[in-house]
Amino acid sequence: MAAVQAPGEKINILAGETAKVGDPQKNEWPEQDRLPERSWRHKCASYVLALRPWSFSASLTPVALGSALAYRSQGVLDPRLLLGCAVAVLAVHGAGNLVNTYYDFSKGIDHKKSDDRTLVDRILEPQDVVRFGVFLYTLGCVCAACLYYLSALKLEHLALIYFGGLSGSFLYTGGIGFKYVALGDLVILITFGPLAVMFAYAVQVGSLAIFPLIYAIPLALSTEAILHSNNTRDMESDREAGIVTLAILIGPTFSYVLYNTLLFVPYLIFTILATHCSISLALPLLTIPMAFSLERQFRSQAFNKLPQRTAKLNLLLGLFYVFGIILAPAGSLPRL
């Protein structure tokens, strides 16, 4: 996303706010440009939209998958642990989205034509985003503490997985800023794939295992497709802003190839599982028409709402995958 500034404005890198040249504060909206006070309902709606809730499939489906694997392998499913795990992962995911909003604005990357205009349009102010992000990270830590109290999982194992995910969500754009040096795809692939599935599985059964990481692969690829479609859409504006993403490195043609790979390899995996293990794993194949629709949209370079539509596919694919695992006969799937 390109850094487009109106004449007479500059970006305050440290504070992440826009200030008029000559404004002595340079860290607050000019008094005459401040928005009028809004109702608490309108502000609550603004906070919800700032979280980008359409992307939450990337965190909810891994939690559901990890819990389903725990149920099928060990016969355990504690609703309290499922709820606590879901809230913890959602809180970290939402906070990570806010960190991304804050740093993209601070670095002058977001602009009036950006998909996320929470700060550009002054829907919220930077300090609002910071406070909300701190609240969500705190909520996630409280949930993690509750999970330790309720689960038999060792503290060091729970802390390793949880704070690994928390660090990934922050460092994606904060601190090191993996997103800006073409490593964001790797962070998302790990955090919202194997790590989240392992977290949900481990808190249920009280121990770690390798096989949930294998079962997480189809979901991880589908989740990465969301990010890659977003980065491909923003390729030109990101290049102008001076940041580097994987989409920029490989170019439009190979970005199209990669998107199709991320989109369709999960179906190949499900076909193999349905053929050799259980027919219930063919359920995710019901979403293939949606995948072909997304492929056509990407090929025609109609990127508007493509990440949101890819997230919808990710949600449906994940739910059918979870149902397929639950419905599979005992012993038909490896390790289940």
From Swiss-Prot:
* Annotated organism of origin: Mus musculus
The protein's assembly and partners: Interacts with HMGCR and SOAT1.
Q: What class of enzyme is it?
A: transferase
One cellular component term from this protein's GO annotations in UniProt: mitochondrial membrane
Similarity comment: family membership: Belongs to the UbiA prenyltransferase family.
Question: What is a GO molecular function of this protein?
Answer: prenyltransferase activity
- Residues crossing the lipid bilayer are 81-101, 132-152, 158-178, 186-206, 207-227, 243-265, 275-295, 313-333
Q: Which Pfam families match?
A: UbiA
**What InterPro entries does the record tag this protein with?**
UbiA_prenyltransferase (IPR000537), UbiA_sf (IPR044878), UBIAD1 (IPR026046)
Q: How does it sit in the membrane?
A: Multi-pass membrane protein
CDD domains (UniProt xref) = PT_UbiA_UBIAD1
Task: Identify the metabolic or biological route this protein is part of.
Answer: Quinol/quinone metabolism; menaquinone biosynthesis; Cofactor biosynthesis; ubiquinone biosynthesis
The protein's predominant localisation is: endoplasmic reticulum
Its annotated function is as follows:
Prenyltransferase that mediates the formation of menaquinone-4 (MK-4) and coenzyme Q10. MK-4 is a vitamin K2 isoform required for endothelial cell development. Mediates the conversion of phylloquinone (PK) into MK-4, probably by cleaving the side chain of phylloquinone (PK) to release 2-methyl-1,4-naphthoquinone (menadione; K3) and then prenylating it with geranylgeranyl pyrophosphate (GGPP) to form MK-4.
The name this protein goes by in its record: UbiA prenyltransferase domain-containing protein 1
Q: Which gene encodes it?
A: Ubiad1
In-chain residues carrying the UniProt-annotated modification N-acetylalanine: A2
The compartments listed are: Endoplasmic reticulum membrane; Golgi apparatus membrane; Mitochondrion membrane
Q: Which reaction does it catalyse?
A: menadiol + (2E,6E,10E)-geranylgeranyl diphosphate = menaquinol-4 + diphosphate; all-trans-decaprenyl diphosphate + 4-hydroxybenzoate = 4-hydroxy-3-(all-trans-decaprenyl)benzoate + diphosphate
Q: What is its EC number?
A: 2.5.1.-, 2.5.1.39
Instruction: List UniProt keywords, sorted A-Z.
Output: Acetylation, Endoplasmic reticulum, Golgi apparatus, Membrane, Menaquinone biosynthesis, Mitochondrion, Prenyltransferase, Transferase, Transmembrane, Transmembrane helix, Ubiquinone biosynthesis
Q: Which GO terms describe its biological process?
A: circulatory system development; endothelial cell development; menaquinone biosynthetic process; menaquinone metabolic process; phylloquinone metabolic process; ubiquinone biosynthetic process; vitamin K biosynthetic process
